[in-house]
From Swiss-Prot:
Keywords: Carbohydrate metabolism, Glycogen biosynthesis, Glycogen metabolism, Glycosyltransferase, Transferase. It comes from Prochlorococcus marinus subsp. pastoris (strain CCMP1986 / NIES-2087 / MED4). Its EC number is 2.4.1.18. It catalyses: Transfers a segment of a (1->4)-alpha-D-glucan chain to a primary hydroxy group in a similar glucan chain. This is 1,4-alpha-glucan branching enzyme GlgB. The active site is at D431 (nucleophile), E484 (proton donor). Gene3D superfamilies: Glycosidases, Golgi alpha-mannosidase II, Immunoglobulins. One of its GO terms (molecular function) is hydrolase activity, hydrolyzing O-glycosyl compounds. One of its GO terms (cellular component) is cytosol. Pfam families: Alpha-amylase, Alpha-amylase_C, CBM_48, GlgB_N. InterPro entries: A-amylase/branching_C, Branching_enzy, GlgB, GlgB_N, GlgB_N_E_set_prok, Glyco_hydro_13_cat_dom, Glyco_hydro_13_N, Glyco_hydro_b. SMART domains: Aamy.
């Protein structure tokens, strides 16, 4: 009777293995002590013959109740000290048995922290890890999928057949399997069978490397095998707050900054030629630059321009170029389009060596519906809300994370820490924060659900953002956390302990819209819109603002910055120079998008590259020279950055000269009264004798003039500077009588008496 029950049980287990319905393969496979004997069972689909090699002796197996379930009796506990010799179609090979390794990978504390959302290094457990288990090298796989019926590892190792390597389900919805037959570089996916019997092939949410599109599998990759050389940079960064330092950011998209001919192959250090990754069909015959090529070309370029940071549009793995990187499927992997994770680390390493920080765009607000991604991951709404009124952005065609679920928040918060810890990034910019904060964002009435208080705030998203920023600054006090938040949500840059969201910078979207609207107006009509220029100061000190002219403003028919400007070419260039100079003198940190630094004419196109040929023309060289000198001046003059978030550092001289569209103001660093005086003329009219009041008598040196010939201007100026006059104006007893060039901004610095 017992033998019949045992046979029926084995037959049932084998049936489940064959049909990918077994969540406990260790219950039947591997070594087992049965009725006083050591029985070893091996599951080997499509095998003709299987033998066990133990202590240099070969033991022939037999099949019991199923043609692919092989069994043998061994004289003692073999543990994992045996090999399987497999014959298929006359070809044989030997391998280790994955089910001989029974030790749990995720410990009790790991599971506990993950379940409560506080495992800040969960990537060290989840995913695929090259690992040595009892003197055997292999790969440990670990994935969270609590609703799955069964999960298998599929890849080249088993011809992508899910019947071969079922995983073991552990507590907390964790699945594990140690694969001694896999190694670095092997492609894989998880084949997930749902409770309803549907099968999904999923990339690894925690994968460190993924295949190049259009393929979408994950690749086993080592993580901690890079020798960093930036310890002094990191120590200095984290020793003090970065927002009290000059920050001038070059925002860019790595894949469209510059291309190369597909005929020019990239030669690796070992002499091997790397297969090129075609950029797109827009420019047939072009390819992306690799991370090493970007290291050699981009970093010197950014350093020469004088920017303090590079901001990279999302480089996490994404399947569709046209998403610009904002529809992420590989959260823990830099995209393979440009190379390997270690090559990206070397890019950052070299940035730090050249004094350049690296900011990544981070997208925790939504994710795409691609079948290999997070959507409906284990047959249920695991990462997203089940109700589309909360869990879907219909206008974007994407899904929204379920921030109320601890494990989902853990996935995201740990991902944030991962990029800082493993890749040494210096900051993040969180995209589309408003879409996270409001339940009714881009939703008509009736297509959203109020929160528990009846409001439209997404309280779970607020809690998540606060947690993410709190944990980030605990680990990395010198980090930058920048919010792209387009509404008037309060306290975005206030600490979480006083109820703020915890960012330390926020893009000033109001300033950006006002300034672009203003500069698009014919200069004659600007006198009626002076408030667009001056209004930003009224709210400037409510948040820690960053002034940004970003990629969003040079796409979708909006024109690039130069071609937003009215008038002929001369006026377009003069307006552009004036706007950029005003931006650099206005309180707030700075960000401009690639191409603006030399007057790109065409709209940005993700499938194209920048119009580098324009630098053959003097006006475009002039814009580039202007940006170079603005960055140099900015870093050398603490008055332009030290009190960005303190009203002490700014004072109007005159903001009411609407008839001339002229504004004047002062910036200062400290009690020394070493004021910088800035005067902006936003019309093409030349003023040969324009008076402004100043607080101190003496000589004011003209230290910058956007109309200089070096920048492509008319070279009208003040012959190096001006002495003050005794003249009462603007509530001051001293005045400067200055020349105001057309469409220009001039900067003067009071010279202290020796």
């Amino acid at each position: 009777m017992k033998e019949t029950i045992q046979a029926d049980w084995i037959k049932s287990e084998a049936f489940n293995l064959e049909n990918c319905c077994n969540d406990n393969p260790l219950n039947i496979l591997g070594p087992h002590f049965v009725n006083g004997q050591w029985i070893t069972r091996v599951w080997m689909p499509e095998a003709d013959e299987v033998n066990i090699i133990f202590k240099d002796k070969t033991y022939k197996t037999t099949t019991l109740n199923h043609k692919w379930l092989f069994e043998v009796t061994l004289p003692e506990d073999p543990k994992n000290n045996y090999q399987i010799n497999v014959s298929r179609g006359g070809v044989s090979h030997s391998q280790q048995d994955p089910w001989a390794y029974r030790k749990e990978w995720m410990g009790e504390l790991d599971r506990h922290l993950f379940a409560e959302g506080n495992h800040h290094h969960i990537w060290e457990k989840m995913g695929a890890h090259i690992h040595e288990e009892t003197n055997q090298q292999g790969v440990m796989f670990c994935i969270w999928a609590p609703n799955a019926k069964s999960i298998s590892i599929i890849g080249d190792i088993n011809s992508w057949d899910g019947r071969h390597h079922p995983m073991q389900k552990r507590l907390g919805g964790i699945w594990e399997l140690f694969m001694p037959i896999m190694k670095e570089g092997d492609a894989y996916k998880y084949e997930i069978r749902t409770q309803e019997g549907h099968i999904y092939e999923k990339a690894d949410p925690y994968g460190f490397l993924h295949e190049i599109r259009p393929q979408n599998g994950s690749i086993v990759s080592k993580l901690n095998n890079f020798d960093w050389e930036d310890s002094s940079w990191i120590t200095n960064r984290d020793s003090s707050s970065q927002i009290n330092k000059p920050i001038s950011v070059y925002e860019m998209h790595l894949g469209s900054w510059m291309h190369d001919s597909i005929e020019n192959k990239y030669i690796e250090k070992n002499g091997q030629t790397r297969s090129p990754v075609p950029a797109a069909d827009l420019k047939p015959g072009t390819r992306f630059l690799t991370y090493p090529e970007l290291t050699e070309k981009l970093i010197p370029y950014v350093k020469e321009r004088g920017f303090t940071h590079i901001e990279l549009m999302p480089i996490s793995e994404h399947p569709f170029d046209g998403s610009w990187g904002y529809q992420v499927t590989g959260w823990y992997a830099p995209t393979s389009r440009y190379g390997t994770p270690n090559e990206f680390k070397e890019f950052i390493n070299r940035c730090h060596a050249e004094g350049i920080g690296v900011i990544l765009d981070w997208v925790p607000g939504h994710f795409p519906k691609d079948k290999h991604g997070l959507a409906f991951f284990d047959g249920c709404h695991l990462y997203e809300h089940g109700d589309p009124r909360i869990g879907e952005h219909k206008e974007w065609g994407t899904l929204i994370f379920n921030y109320s679920r601890n494990e989902v928040r853990n996935f995201l918060v740990a991902n944030l820490i991962y990029w800082f810890e493993e890749f040494h990034i210096d900051g993040i910019r969180v995209d589309a924060v408003a879409s996270m904060l409001y339940r009714d964002y881009l939703r008509p009435e009736g297509e959203w659900i109020p929160n528990e208080n009846g409001g439209n705030e997404n309280l779970e998203a607020v809690k998540f953002l606060q947690q993410a920023n709190h944990v980030l600054f605990q680990h990395f006090p010198g980090a930058l956390s920048i919010a792209e938040e387009s509404t008037t949500w309060p306290m975005v840059t206030e600490p979480t302990n006083v109820g703020g969201l915890g960012f330390n910078l926020k893009w000033n979207m109001g300033w950006m819209h006002d300034m672009l609207d203003y500069f698009e107006i014919d200069p004659w009509f600007r006198q009626f819109h002076q408030n667009s220029v001056t209004f930003s100061i009224t709210y400037n000190y409510t948040e820690n603002f960053m002034l940004a002219l970003s990629h969003d403003e040079v796409v979708h028919g909006k024109s690039h910055l130069l071609h937003k400007m009215p008038g002929d070419d001369w006026k377009k260039f003069a307006n552009t120079r004036a706007l950029l100079t005003y931006m650099w003198t206005h309180p707030g940190k700075k960000t401009i998008f690639m191409g603006m630094e030399f007057g790109q004419r065409q709209e940005w196109n993700v499938w194209d590259d920048l119009q580098w040929e324009l630098l053959e023309f003097e006006p475009h060289k002039g814009i580039r020279n202007l940006v170079d000198d603005l960055n140099k001046l900015y870093k050398n003059e603490p008055s332009l950055w030290k009190n960005d978030f303190d009203p002490y550092g700014f004072q109007w001289i005159d903001c009411n000269d609407t008839s001339n569209s002229v504004i004047s103001f002062m910036r200062r660093e400290n009690e020394s009264n070493e004021w910088l005086v800035i005067v902006a003329n936003f019309t093409p009219n030349f003023h040969g004798s324009y008076k402004i009041g100043v607080p101190l008598e003496g000589f004011y040196k003209e230290i910058f003039n956007s109309d200089g010939s070096k920048y492509g201007g008319s070279n009208k100026g003040n012959m190096g500077g001006k002495e003050t006059l005794k003249y009462n104006i603007h509530n001051y007893e001293n005045a400067l009588e200055i020349v105001l060039p057309p469409l220009s901004v001039s900067i003067f610095k009071h010279q202290l008496k020796q």
